Amino acid sequence: MDTMGRHIIAELWDCNPEKLNDMEYVERLFVDAALQAGAEVREVAFHKFAPHGVSGVVIISESHLTIHSFPEHGYASVDVFTCGDRIDPAIAAHYIADGLDAKIRENVEIPRGMGPVEVPAATVQHVN
């Protein structure tokens, strides 16, 4: 294994607004996505905002899945982070996008834990 984990950041647009605003549906979708990927679910926490929107997290033994939904824009911000090489986060990310009826899907995968990031000296800020 070259990395400690894989992190998929998914931008989902033109989603079904009713699904994005249904906390119970989104929670079930995320738990099912984790299970479809072969992950072990540990904790689940979701919150419904007024007048609309859902945020939530599914903690898995291998890391986490998160969402912030904006039904009024048909948009969802989704993260799927898995540690190790046993679980493929893309399986969960695609399952979620399908479940939200996302017509536009932009996924970026970032390898995690590959060592210190080299930052040019001019951009480093020291916080006291």
Curated annotation (Swiss-Prot):
Enzymatic reactions: S-adenosyl-L-methionine + H(+) = S-adenosyl 3-(methylsulfanyl)propylamine + CO2
Single Gene Ontology BP annotation: spermidine biosynthetic process
Site (Cleavage (non-hydrolytic)): E62, S63
Classification via InterPro entries: AdoMetDC_C, AdoMetDC_fam_prok, AdoMetDC_N, S-AdoMet_deCO2ase_core, S-AdoMet_deCOase_pro-enz
Enzyme Commission code(s) on record: 4.1.1.50
Active site residues per record: S63, H68, C83
Post-translational note: Is synthesized initially as an inactive proenzyme. Formation of the active enzyme involves a self-maturation process in which the active site pyruvoyl group is generated from an internal serine residue via an autocatalytic post-translational modification. Two non-identical subunits are generated from the proenzyme in this reaction, and the pyruvate is formed at the N-terminus of the alpha chain, which is derived from the carboxyl end of the proenzyme.
Domain of life: Bacteria
Residue numbers bearing the Pyruvic acid (Ser) modification: S63
Cofactor details (free text): Binds 1 pyruvoyl group covalently per subunit.
Necessary cofactors: pyruvate
GO cellular component: cytosol
Known pathway: Amine and polyamine biosynthesis; S-adenosylmethioninamine biosynthesis; S-adenosylmethioninamine from S-adenosyl-L-methionine: step 1/1
Keywords from the named record: Autocatalytic cleavage, Decarboxylase, Lyase, Polyamine biosynthesis, Pyruvate, S-adenosyl-L-methionine, Schiff base, Spermidine biosynthesis, Zymogen
GO molecular function, a single term: adenosylmethionine decarboxylase activity
Recorded family membership: Belongs to the prokaryotic AdoMetDC family. Type 1 subfamily.
Assembly: Heterotetramer of two alpha and two beta chains arranged as a dimer of alpha/beta heterodimers.
NCBIfam families from the UniProt entry: SAM_DCase_Bsu
Function: Catalyzes the decarboxylation of S-adenosylmethionine to S-adenosylmethioninamine (dcAdoMet), the propylamine donor required for the synthesis of the polyamines spermine and spermidine from the diamine putrescine.
Protein name: S-adenosylmethionine decarboxylase proenzyme
The organism of origin for this protein: Exiguobacterium sibiricum (strain DSM 17290 / CCUG 55495 / CIP 109462 / JCM 13490 / 255-15)
The encoding gene: speH
